[in-house]
């Protein structure tokens, strides 16, 4: 019997979404989501294997090569995507609850964070609505220059565990609005948000095979990246995994986009107040328990200010209240 966190209502967590249908995983195995608060299992969902990956790519390939989505007028794609966004707006409390339970993000931050992410999707729809997919360009002589923006094809969207909704939803948004089909591969630690995205696509009437969902561990994900039916890989995650994806895609001349690890730096100038700098730095260090790309984990300061700033940061850190992520008193 599948398990879900309190407040999360997913219809088929024990299934995969392939070709417009909720289907059982080939292996019958289930993924377990472990709470960072208690180390207890708080949710389970179906685990895809290599056969499931092939089935999802085949469904996305058929939907792109033979289905209506790539040739649907952009305005109609926008309208369908707006229906997805409207559905997601009603699911913000569930998205927040899923994130807090799986990832350990603060409940006090989860609602505004996911509400903002859904608002961002509406802005992407606005951008797509105004984008000119066919553009005339000035040329020399009498010939007419026309640039036609066409969909790439099948996109493998691979998202990490720390921002599982916003990152995956953005990948899906741009792919769908440009006429591509998608295979979503969420992190095995935080896959529930992708289920809600799949349910939103289903509720919006997105054609079968355009959006597919296959949560898995690394081995099956590697098989997905190697599948020649995938035209583009959109990956956010570790540098190590990104190197592997670049190698595989390079060998088969497939497009890929990598958003990898980094070390964000803050540059503190001579004229910036010490206390303000300390509050800013510690605020990012503690956001999402320090597990986020926007964390300013490195500070470049004048040598003369080093000790002063270090002491101010230490004083700020001593005021941090430790607790479970579902405690709304924690900010």
Predicted segment positions?
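Terminal low-complexity tails and localization/encapsulation signals of metabolic enzymes
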Residues: 1-45, 79-83, 131-158, 257
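Residue-level signal for inorganic ion chemistry
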Residues: 39, 77, 99, 179, ...
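Glycine-rich loop-to-alpha-helix module at the N-terminal edge of alpha/beta enzyme cores
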Residues: 42-131
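Structural signal for hydrophobic packing residues in well-ordered secondary-structure cores
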Residues: 64, 68, 85-92, 96, ...
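Short linear capping/connector segments at secondary-structure termini
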Residues: 98-106, 136-141, 326-331
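Rossmann-like NAD(P) dinucleotide-binding subdomain of oxidoreductase/dehydrogenase enzymes
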Residues: 133-276
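ALDH superfamily catalytic-core signature
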Residues: 240-331
